[in-house]
């Protein structure tokens, strides 16, 4: 079983059916095995739900909630925040949300971290995959 941590951009592109990216993400998801798990954190949920809440778009909010109900939410513990703190100290360019995402994926032994952010690959190249590079 593989555990795949989804960056917020991947969830947003997929749920909102981004013209350039949604079909590629859907194909990647369809190629996963039955026992593979798509994972997210409470921080991903926060990042995805801000705009629908801000704009009072209940339809989009419901789409996100439906998506999250079918995936695996990973807890964010004090140990994860400590690991994120160390990552921030080690990598000057790393922002706090990205440090938390990486720390969460590492802590929970995720096999891959799907993103569209090339900067993260230099920090954890064996984990981070820019799945939207064409």
What kind of region is each of these model predictions?
Residues 17-18, 51, 87, 126-127:
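Residue-level signal for well-ordered alpha-helical positions
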Residues 8, 42, 98-102:
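Conserved glycosyltransferase catalytic-site signature
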Residues 1-3, 28-30, 102, 106-134:
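Acidic, PIN/NYN-like endoribonuclease modules and their adjacent C-terminal/linker elements
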Residues 1-40, 52-63, 132-134:
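Short, well-structured N-terminal submotif of metal-dependent ribonuclease cores
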């Amino acid at each position: 079983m593989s555990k795949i941590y989804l960056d917020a951009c991947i969830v947003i592109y997929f749920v909102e059916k981004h013209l350039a990216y949604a079909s590629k993400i859907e194909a990647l998801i369809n190629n996963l095995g039955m026992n593979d798990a798509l994972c997210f954190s409470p921080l991903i949920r926060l990042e995805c739900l801000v705009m629908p809440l801000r704009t009072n778009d209940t339809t989009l909010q419901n789409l996100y909630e439906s998506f999250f109900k079918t995936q695996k939410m990973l807890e964010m513990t004090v140990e994860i925040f400590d690991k994120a703190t160390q990552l921030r100290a080690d990598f000057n360019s790393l922002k706090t949300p990205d440090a938390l995402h990486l720390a969460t994926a590492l802590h929970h032994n995720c096999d891959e971290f799907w993103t569209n952010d090339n900067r993260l690959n230099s920090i954890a190249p064996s984990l981070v995959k820019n799945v939207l590079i064409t």
